[in-house]
Amino acid sequence: MDISRAEQRILHLLAQGGRIDLVRDEAGKLTDAHCYSRDGWRYTGLDMALFRKLKRRRTIASERGQPYRITRRGLQLVRSQPDNC
């Protein structure tokens, strides 16, 4: 399965130890998703449409309320590259 360049960038960042944190409003509805590198830097290339696409393809998952991380399937799909360019 081919994945887009934007998906590739997010998965590569997650494969290096990054995470995706969800932002919810007062009613508990999902409003935004923030992607962080392992160093704590926020990556701005993640929007809700891309988050849903990654989740639907089962390349990311959350366990026990923790931030979203890359799955084994996501690791198989990601291609190696020296940086996130």
UniProtKB/Swiss-Prot annotation:
Taxonomically, the superkingdom here is Bacteria
Q: Which Pfam families match?
A: YjhX_toxin
Similarity remark: Belongs to the UPF0386 family.
Instruction: Output the HAMAP family linked to this UniProt entry.
Output: UPF0386 (MF_00827)
Q: What is this protein's record name? A: UPF0386 protein HNE_3437
Originating species: Hyphomonas neptunium (strain ATCC 15444)
